[in-house]
């Protein structure tokens, strides 16, 4: 009837078998096709780059992204799950440069742009098979056979439509400004790309003396963290609100901020004059490096609000060619712009001492030069956060150039409004990391001076006219001899000319491609080739109900999605977002190849399986927190949840197969057993709780609720009901046990299906499909179980939960006293209200206690120690801690402990403080310990006391329990079946022989022994029975 299963469970083999079943039955496609008439639920899959290998961070994103769509399919939604590939941009180009052994744009041009672009195109799916393999192994169900691909002409055409729409809204413009620039890649970067590449670096700073014009030995002391920009200096910035001083030192007069003088100046000095910064404004000084003569007035002091007294001298060197703040100041005061650096980040020929040298490498040479000519006051190492290229790791320069921008500053208010509509998990992303980024949003520099990307569809004429093309049809209409099969990439698109409608001359496409983040941010509509086709599909599936990616996407995909949808559609493109933290090694350190601590996800999947890996990520921590990950962590996850569920499943199949129990024959049977009613009530409460959690995207909470339920199912329900399954007759009570456990298992696999799809399917196939040929063929094609209020009994759940809690506390007290559970004890005192006798009997049986007493006063059996929780109270009331300690010690310790343990607050007064201090379980530490002869345990308002004195009678019973345990283990080790009769033999201990004879009938009954014999000559197993030696042998009765 049921397939035989391995009790240990080889989960990896099981998952391979289930993956084959899904393939053979086309279950994945059937899941995609389900609920054709249902309400749409849209999930966007953030496109990875397929020319890079998947790593453990991608495992996290895939398991999180998979769960919600699975759940929504079971809830009746039509869920779109289209995979995508991000195929353009620097990541691809850099890989090809590496492959070809070339570096930088000049070598690419020499190699040939057409050949280079072809290499890029051919490479983008290099690791597709690895991505597909990982996705299949994980059970990540997205349509990878029909993905959207950002280099396809249809996709590019939709992106062109978006750019044309922005052009028509006057959001797309060309500007000359200082932009973050990668000299190695030869292109500008956007602000959100820059935000992803900051690193703390230690560099030499310069305190530079600028000679005041017309004054002998008088200098303005300025500071810079970028000495290479000094040859382009045209002004010095101060803050007119600050106080400045002129000091005399070693015959020189130096000017700097008053509050920084002591920190900056070395040696003795004398203050000659003190004045407001306003007096400095307009002061002229001599040019520091005379490599270029400026074409405008320069070399004087200006005011700037960004000058602070945090570091430096309160005077900042200003070079408008190389910094955003400097550039704005330059525009404000109409300062000249001296650019002495070429597109590769090297000094031009006019900078004779350092021509052709990369500017960062020139820093020490410049410092040495200034030291020799006396303009360097001093140099110090300074650690600061500096932007690096997010792809090649080169330090960025801020560089003046023509670029194309999207006018995001004009959309700032709408961006913030749309951001507030998004349900962020965690919520603080809205106003924190992402919200702050939006508050300070700048125009998006989307153009890239590169080769492999979506070409910017703007054509320019020498007369000044510009055209933005929004479709292939428009290109053919306005272009000259455009081929029908036009390839929209460079260099082919560069050959397409337009005729200028104003002057009749040829128009040429601007040379740039666009930021690849614009590509991925366009996927909501570009994946459907909107607006050229699939208009209805797009409108039904926009915005997405759910997305999830790593936290760094707040500066990447999360931003580009919101920015583009706000610009085009005036709304947000996603409604719910789970932000994921980073994956760390087992010690909590960032994984890196150099440290040798990178965990290969394929190894873990091969050794431990997908379900265990998935469950680890669902339960290890909240999704947005950093998660430690190692194979050992996954093993522990498997033990806690999967193995527990498997053991319950195995237990059911073992006994149901023995009895040939078919639940379909008992569909209308209703059990009156209290434990059955309790577990069915708990099951339905679980269904409702998990449903509410998943509806609110609380994945960890839902998973932990499920884990707790399975723990109670195994360690309480099954444990308490084993004997019902052992009965030889198929009584109503046994039918009730079977029917209940079957119902729980076949329901729980539906709840667990989105989390652990393989094990859920395995159990479903054996328990449901095996028995019913008309059953739905996969658990993943089933509907979510319905919450049945009629079986929910909150009072029953509360009573049973309290009994179980008391049992766990009793076990804890036993462990604390180092007394095994098999050793009977005389009495247990319980602080809580009385429970019906049924539960008292359970507690006695579970804890091996003769008597229980509810509502007991435990104060006479315990010592209390109540102390302030210093990290909490100390932070709030630091200097009052001694007085708080005194107040606490003067109170009734038992009463205070009971109030705190019951969740009540207690208020105290302390000398010197007007307000009362509230004492709670959060700011107090309550330690309670049983007195001699008693063991205590307590938690959340429940306390128990065990009397630990062991009488001779109790000691004998303890021996018997221990002997029964040893015999049962020997039965298992000998391979006996559960129902096999045995013969028992003991030897080697007269004391225990007396006890065995006294309890012989009981031992026979419990072990199915037909004979007990003593001191025969045979092979025995040596055993320890509570410190006593005993020889035991078992033999199967023929």
From Swiss-Prot:
Q: Which residues bind ATP?
A: 593
Q: Name one GO biological process term.
A: isoleucyl-tRNA aminoacylation
- Documented EC number(s): 6.1.1.5
Find motif ('KMSKS' region) and give its ranges: 590-594
State the source organism's domain of life.
Answer: Bacteria
> Which residues, if any, are the signal sequence?
none
Q: In chain numbering, where does the motif 'HIGH' region fall?
A: 48-58
Cite the entry's keywords alphabetically: Aminoacyl-tRNA synthetase, ATP-binding, Cytoplasm, Ligase, Metal-binding, Nucleotide-binding, Protein biosynthesis, Zinc
Q: Which GO terms describe its cellular component?
A: cytoplasm
Q: Pfam families from the entry?
A: Anticodon_1, DUF5915, tRNA-synt_1
UniProt cofactor(s): Zn(2+)
The UniProt GO MF terms for this protein read: aminoacyl-tRNA deacylase activity; ATP binding; isoleucine-tRNA ligase activity; tRNA binding; zinc ion binding
Q: Extract the InterPro entries matched here.
A: aa-tRNA-synth_I_CS, aa-tRNA-synth_Ia, Anticodon_Ile_ABEc, Ile-tRNA-ligase, Ile-tRNA-ligase_type2, M/V/L/I-tRNA-synth_anticd-bd, Rossmann-like_a/b/a_fold, tRNAsynth_Ia_anticodon-bd
The answer, when asked if Cytoplasm is one of the entry's keywords, is yes
The UniProt catalytic activity note for this protein reads: tRNA(Ile) + L-isoleucine + ATP = L-isoleucyl-tRNA(Ile) + AMP + diphosphate
Mostly located where?
Answer: cytoplasm
Q: What role is this protein assigned?
A: Catalyzes the attachment of isoleucine to tRNA(Ile). As IleRS can inadvertently accommodate and process structurally similar amino acids such as valine, to avoid such errors it has two additional distinct tRNA(Ile)-dependent editing activities. One activity is designated as 'pretransfer' editing and involves the hydrolysis of activated Val-AMP. The other activity is designated 'posttransfer' editing and involves deacylation of mischarged Val-tRNA(Ile).
Q: What NCBIfam families would the database entry show? A: ileS
Comment text on domains: IleRS has two distinct active sites: one for aminoacylation and one for editing. The misactivated valine is translocated from the active site to the editing site, which sterically excludes the correctly activated isoleucine. The single editing site contains two valyl binding pockets, one specific for each substrate (Val-AMP or Val-tRNA(Ile)).
Similarity remark: Belongs to the class-I aminoacyl-tRNA synthetase family. IleS type 2 subfamily.
Q: How does it assemble?
A: Monomer.
- HAMAP family in UniProt: Ile_tRNA_synth_type2
Q: What is this protein called?
A: Isoleucine--tRNA ligase
């Amino acid at each position: 009837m049921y397939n035989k299963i391995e009790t240990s469970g080889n989960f990896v083999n099981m998952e391979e078998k289930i993956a084959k079943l899904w393939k053979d039955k086309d279950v994945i496609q059937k899941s995609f096709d389900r609920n054709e008439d249902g309400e749409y639920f849209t999930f966007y899959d953030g496109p990875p780059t397929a020319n890079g290998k998947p790593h453990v961070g991608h495992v996290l994103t895939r398991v999180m992204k998979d769960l919600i769509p699975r759940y929504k399919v079971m809830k009746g939604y039509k869920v779109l799950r289209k995979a995508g590939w991000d195929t353009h941009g620097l990541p691809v180009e850099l890989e090809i440069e590496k492959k070809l052994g070339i570096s930088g744009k000049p070598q690419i041009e020499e190699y040939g742009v057409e050949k280079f672009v072809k290499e890029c195109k051919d490479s983008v799916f290099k690791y597709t098979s690895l991505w597909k393999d990982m996705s299949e192994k994980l059970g990540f169900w997205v349509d990878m056979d029909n993905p959207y691909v950002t280099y396809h002409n249809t996709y590019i055409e939709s992106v062109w439509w978006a750019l044309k729409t922005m052009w028509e809204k006057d959001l797309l413009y060309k500007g000359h400004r200082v932009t973050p620039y990668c000299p190695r890649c030869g292109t500008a970067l956007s602000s959100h790309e820059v935000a992803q590449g900051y690193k703390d670096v230690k560099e030499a700073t310069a305190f530079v003396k600028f000679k005041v014009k017309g004054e002998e030995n008088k200098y303005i002391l300025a500071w810079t963290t970028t000495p290479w920009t000094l040859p382009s200096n045209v002004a010095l910035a101060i803050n007119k609100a600050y106080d400045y001083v002129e000091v005399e030192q070693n015959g020189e007069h130096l000017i700097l901020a008053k509050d920084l003088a002591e920190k900056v100046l070395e040696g003795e000095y004398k203050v000659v004059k003190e004045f407001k910064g306003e007096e400095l404004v307009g002061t002229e000084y001599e040019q520091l490096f005379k490599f270029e003569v400026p074409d405008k007035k320069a070399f004087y002091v200006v005011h700037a609000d960004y000058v602070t007294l945090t570091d430096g001298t309160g005077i900042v060197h200003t070079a408008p060619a190389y910094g955003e703040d400097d550039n704005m100041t330059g525009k404000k005061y109409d300062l000249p712009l001296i650019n002495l650096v070429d597109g590769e980040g090297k000094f031009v020929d006019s900078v004779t001492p350092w021509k052709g040298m990369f500017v960062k490498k020139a820093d020490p040479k410049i410092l040495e030069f200034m030291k020799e000519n006396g303009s360097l006051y001093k140099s110090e190492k300074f650690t600061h956060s500096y932007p690096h290229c997010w792809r090649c790791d080169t330090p960025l320069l801020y560089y003046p150039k023509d670029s194309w921008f999207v006018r995001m500053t004009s959309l700032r208010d709408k961006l913030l409004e749309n951001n507030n509509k998004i349900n962020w998990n965690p919520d603080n992303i809205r106003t924190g990391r992402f919200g702050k980024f939006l508050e300070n949003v700048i125009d998006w520099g989307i153009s890239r001076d590169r080769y492999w990307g979506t070409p910017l569809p703007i054509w320019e004429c020498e007369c000044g006219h510009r055209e933005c093309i929004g479709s292939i049809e428009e290109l053919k209409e306005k272009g000259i001899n455009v081929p029908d099969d036009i390839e929209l990439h460079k260099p082919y698109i560069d050959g397409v000319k337009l005729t200028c409608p104003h002057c009749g001359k040829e128009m040429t496409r601007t040379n740039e491609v666009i930021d690849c983040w614009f590509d991925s941010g366009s996927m909501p509509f570009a994946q459907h080739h909107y607006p050229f086709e699939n208009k209805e599909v797009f409108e039904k599936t926009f915005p997405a109900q759910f997305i999830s990616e790593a936290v760094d996407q707040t500066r990447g995909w999360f931003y580009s999605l919101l920015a583009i949808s706000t610009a085009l559609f005036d709304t947000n493109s996603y409604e719910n977002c789970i932000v994921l933290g980073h994956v760390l090694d087992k010690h909590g350190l960032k994984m890196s190849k150099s440290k040798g601590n990178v965990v290969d996800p394929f190894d873990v999947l091969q050794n431990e399986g997908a379900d265990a890996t998935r469950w680890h990520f669902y339960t290890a921590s909240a999704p947005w927190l950093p998660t430690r990950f190692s194979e050992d962590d996954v093993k522990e996850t498997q033990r806690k949840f999967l193995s527990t569920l498997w053991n319950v499943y195995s237990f059911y199949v073992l006994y149901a197969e023995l009895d040939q129990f078919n639940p379909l024959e008992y569909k209308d049977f209703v059990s009156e057993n209290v434990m059955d009613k309790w577990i069915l009530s708990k099951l339905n409460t679980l269904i409702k709780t998990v449903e509410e959690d998943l509806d609110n995207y609380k994945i960890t909470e839902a998973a932990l609720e499920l884990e707790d339920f399975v723990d109670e199912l195994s360690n309480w329900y099954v444990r308490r009901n084993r004997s019902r399954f052992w009965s030889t007759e198929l009584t109503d009570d046994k039918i009730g046990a079977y029917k209940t456990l079957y119902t729980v298992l076949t329901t729980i696999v539906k709840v667990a299906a989105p989390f652990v799809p393989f094990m859920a399917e395995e159990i479903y196939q054996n328990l449901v499909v095996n028995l019913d040929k008309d059953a739905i063929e996969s658990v993943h094609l089933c509907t979510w179980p319905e919450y049945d209020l009629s079986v929910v009994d909150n009072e029953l759940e509360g009573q049973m939960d309290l009994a179980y809690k008391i049992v766990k506390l009793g076990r804890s007290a036993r462990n604390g006293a180092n007394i095994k559970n098999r050793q009977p004890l005389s009495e247990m005192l319980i602080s809580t209200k009385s429970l019906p006798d049924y539960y008292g009997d359970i507690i006695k049986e579970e804890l091996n206690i003769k008597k229980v007493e509810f509502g007991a006063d435990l104060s006479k059996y315990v010592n209390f120690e109540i102390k302030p929780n210093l990290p909490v109270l100390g932070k709030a009331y630091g200097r009052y801690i001694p007085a708080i300690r005194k107040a606490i010690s003067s109170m009734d310790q038992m009463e205070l402990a009971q109030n705190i343990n019951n969740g009540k607050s207690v208020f105290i007064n302390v000398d010197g403080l007007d307000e009362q201090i509230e004492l709670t379980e959060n700011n107090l530490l309550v330690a309670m310990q049983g007195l001699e002869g008693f063991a205590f345990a307590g938690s959340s308002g429940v306390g128990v006391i065990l009397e630990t004195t062991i009488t001779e009678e109790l000691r004998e019973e303890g021996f018997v329990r221990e002997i029964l345990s040893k015999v049962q283990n020997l039965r298992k080790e000998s391979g006996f079946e559960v129902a096999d009769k045995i013969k028992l033999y003991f030897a080697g201990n007269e004391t225990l022989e007396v006890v065995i004879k006294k309890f012989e009938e009981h031992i026979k009954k419990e072990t199915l022994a037909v004979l007990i014999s003593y001191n025969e000559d045979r092979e025995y197993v040596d055993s320890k029975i509570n410190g006593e030696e005993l020889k035991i042998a078992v033999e199967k009765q023929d």
